[in-house]
Amino acid sequence: MANGNSATLTRRYNRTVVLDALRRHGSLSRVELARLSGLTPQGIRNIIEDLIDTGLVRETGRRRGQRGQPQIDIEINPGAGYCLGLHVAAGLCHAIATDLAGNVLARPEARAFNGDHGQRLNALEVISHEIEAAAGGLSRLGTGVVVSRPLASRWSATGGLADAQAEFAKPFEALFASAPLVFENDANAAAMAEYTHGQAKGRGDFLYLFLGEGVGGAIVQSGVPVHGGRGNAGEFGHILIDPKGPKCHCGNRGCLHGYLALDGLRHFLPTDAPLAPETLPQAWLDGAASALSRALVSLENIFDPQAIVLGGTAPVWLLHKLVERMGDPGPSVRSDAAETRVEVSGLGQSCALIGAAALPLLALTSPDPATLMKEPSVET
């Protein structure tokens, strides 16, 4: 017999199943939700009643032009609260607040984020006050924090952290742990932005190649980023392109990083020359496009993704130049796919920040079967 704790976990899981269906499909009737989720009609009615009471979903009216009793559509209520996204990079903390439909409510000026715990906490307090003032009384439903480096694991406010990560997390936990708090690396966050708002929407199995000062990536399976045993999955920048190629900081030679990363591109530019379409060296573009083509063929053969999205903090025009110069990659298991094999992100250089705000939304709406197996907490 199920005890009270397992029944509570089951209800929570079923609730996320319903929210996930609404997030992916938009407006749905109770009948459609029952069919998509596999839950009973009575179970759906109970869940929807609870979600309406909490304000997370709303009825949008009856459908017209159908036989019989018109069905009532249900959708996630965009104004149920806001999600806060924070991206820490190059000594700055960037912030954004969105509603549950992804509409931007506030995007304050980036703040310096260095120094000791107190200085960082002060910067976050300023950001928090600016966001709250712009949110118009909406409740914060969660916070996503994105950093430009791999993490030992997908952080949560209750998960175990390595010492350095735990120290970094302290000011965020001091201000934001009252609601779900999720930490993630920039490539995985950018991939989640694509999954919720961009090129990968509706496609749960895809790869994301993050091009910036370095080269990273994300592997998304069933709508969830793969982190690997030590949090380093998706380090596409260290795919070996040419064993006789340039020396990489990892110790190998000929890694993709050496051909694609912006820090390497600058060595091709005259001193103090700006990175612009008219100054882009053809020699770099030729080598980068060739290396990208080789890497993509390998990735397709290993993962057979529904899509590969190219994005990051590199200028969008540069991403398009790379794809145009590359042309169609060589033969792979996806060679005969009807879809475009490589798609450039439409989210621009703020992709990781947009993804940071998407993280708490996904935490709220993504069903995780592992939650059904959690041990009951012991209260003292």
Can you describe what each PLM-predicted range is?
Residues 73, 83-87, 140-146, 206-210, ...:
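Short glycine-aspartate micro-motif
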Residues 168-172, 226-228, 234-241, 326-336:
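Acidic-glycine-rich active-site phosphate/pyrophosphate-binding loop
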Residues 203-259:
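Glycine-rich phosphate-binding loop of actin/hexokinase-like ATP-binding domains
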Residues 63, 148-151, 212-214, 314-315:
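Short glycine-rich anion-binding loops that position phosphate/pyrophosphate groups of nucleotides
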Residues 104-205, 319-332:
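Glycine-rich phosphate-binding loop and adjoining helix at the ATP-binding site
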Residues 1-60, 66-111, 115-130, 136-139, ...:
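ATP-binding/phosphotransfer module of carbohydrate and carboxylate kinases, centering on a glycine-rich
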Residues 186, 212, 356:
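Active-site glycine-centered loops adjacent to acidic/histidine catalytic or metal-binding residues
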Residues 24-25, 197, 212:
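Short helix-capping/turn signature of helix-turn-helix
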